[in-house]
């Protein structure tokens, strides 16, 4: 692995150009599994005045598949098959599905009459294999960010910032289900694809029952570079530090995120799913912390907020508008308060007590971790002793 970084001051101390600086970096990595990868980033920072600056960055990053995704041993698994080549399913996919199914079944020796009435029904849970995939390649992420920082000299200790981000991940690693493999196989342009290679079918004369001709006899589930993700949002923060002569130091911190979109596509051609605002991915999250230090004492009070989220995916709600009573459609917002008091001795030994979830907010109906943990209000106390305190 090797890398290089570059910083180029372009203009400085000029009207409307207090600072203009370009920066860039490149990294080349050679993996024994996926070979050579290249990542890079380029950015620009412009400060028209000393108190205010704009910044932007474009970057490409990669993630090499991990050891489990590559080399997981084979294990048996089971699945119920819904064959896309059944006579009543051939027109429910891509424009090439019907032609591919005909070619596939003819290649197995089925007659026109058998193909016309083919159901693909195995009548039972079908055994298959789950294993790693040594042919995986790296995931690639492309990121665009731009934002602003305001640090006014007339209000010492105040820092305001906001950054917009746009991230797209291609060739993401995911493991298609058995039924998804079947659909991807025949919905592709041709049958010469990696998905068909993971499906076994019984040729004419190859089974104990003539009715098994053409039926799926086995499958192999493997991680593949088939998924895609994208997200957009805004990170924002405000920090204010107020030192005083007699009352100690006050620190205020306000950090948040607005999730504009979070789209996932599990496999090529699959529906794009919007997850922003769905359980686990709130559109708004904010953390506020107040910290006060006076001599050896420190007090911290924190508030963690997340807005309401849908209990079910938008696709599930669209398919069944009455999936749940209206009052349970959304999970309550999180408004958790935490407090801690710490005393540190002159020898750096510290004692602390605190309460998490001060007002004992509970999880929503039917949930254990949303919007808060089922643990409820939590009291704790402790002591921290370093080796120096013990004389070694």
Predicted regions and their residues:
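Surface-exposed extracellular loop regions of Gram-negative outer-membrane beta-barrel proteins
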Residues: 1-49, 141-147
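Residues that define the transmembrane beta-barrel architecture of outer-membrane proteins
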Residues: 2, 36-38, 130, 140-144, ...
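Transmembrane beta-strands of outer-membrane beta-barrel pores
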Residues: 10, 26-32, 58-64, 71-73, ...
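Short loop/turn motifs that connect adjacent beta-strands in outer-membrane beta-barrel proteins
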Residues: 11-20, 51, 92-97, 153-159, ...
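Transmembrane beta-strands of outer-membrane beta-barrel proteins
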Residues: 18-24, 40, 54-56, 146, ...
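Outer-membrane beta-barrel signature, preferentially recognizing the C-terminal barrel domain
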Residues: 68-160, 219-234, 281-283
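Gram-negative outer-membrane beta-barrel transporters
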Residues: 159-315
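C-terminal beta-signal and adjacent terminal beta-strands/loops
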Residues: 170, 260-263, 304-319, 342-392
């Amino acid at each position: 692995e090797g890398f290089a970084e570059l910083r180029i001051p372009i203009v400085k101390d000029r009207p409307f150009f207090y600072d203009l600086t370009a920066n860039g970096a490149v990294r080349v990595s050679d993996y024994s599994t996926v070979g050579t990868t290249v990542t890079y980033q380029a950015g620009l920072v412009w400060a028209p005045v000393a108190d205010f600056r704009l910044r932007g960055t474009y970057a490409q990053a990669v993630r090499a598949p991990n050891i489990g995704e590559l080399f997981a041993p084979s294990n048996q698994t089971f699945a119920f098959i819904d064959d896309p080549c059944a006579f009543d399913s051939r027109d429910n996919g891509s424009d090439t599905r019907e032609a591919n199914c005909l070619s596939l079944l003819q290649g197995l020796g089925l007659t026109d009459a058998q193909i016309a009435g083919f159901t693909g029904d195995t009548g039972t849970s079908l055994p298959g294999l789950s294993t790693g995939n040594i042919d995986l390649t790296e995931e690639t992420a492309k990121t665009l960010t731009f934002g602003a920082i305001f640090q006014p000299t007339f209000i010492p200790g105040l820092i305001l910032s906001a950054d917009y981000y746009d991230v797209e991940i291609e060739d993401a690693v995911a493991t298609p289900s058995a039924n998804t493999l079947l659909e991807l196989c025949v919905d592709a342009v041709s049958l010469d694809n990696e998905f068909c290679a993971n499906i076994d079918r019984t040729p004419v004369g190859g089974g104990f029952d003539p009715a098994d001709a053409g039926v799926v006899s086995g499958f192999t589930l493997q991680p593949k570079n088939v998924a895609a993700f994208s997200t957009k949002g805004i990170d924002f923060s405000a920090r204010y530090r107020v030192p005083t002569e007699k009352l100690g130091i006050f620190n205020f911190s306000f950090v948040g995120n607005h999730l504009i979109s979070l789209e996932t596509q599990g496999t090529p051609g699959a529906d794009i799913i919007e997850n922003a605002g769905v359980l686990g991915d709130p559109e708004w999250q904010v953390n506020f912390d107040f910290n006060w230090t006076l001599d050896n004492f420190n007090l911290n009070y924190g508030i963690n907020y997340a807005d309401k989220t849908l209990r079910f995916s938008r696709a599930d709600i669209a398919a069944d508008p009455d999936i749940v009573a209206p009052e349970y459609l959304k999970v309550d917002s999180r408004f958790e308060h935490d407090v801690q008091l710490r005393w540190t001795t002159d020898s750096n030994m510290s004692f602390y007590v605190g309460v998490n979830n001060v007002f004992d907010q509970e999880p929503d109906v039917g949930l254990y971790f949303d919007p808060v943990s089922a643990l409820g209000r939590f009291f704790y106390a402790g002591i921290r002793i370093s080796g120096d305190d013990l004389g070694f």
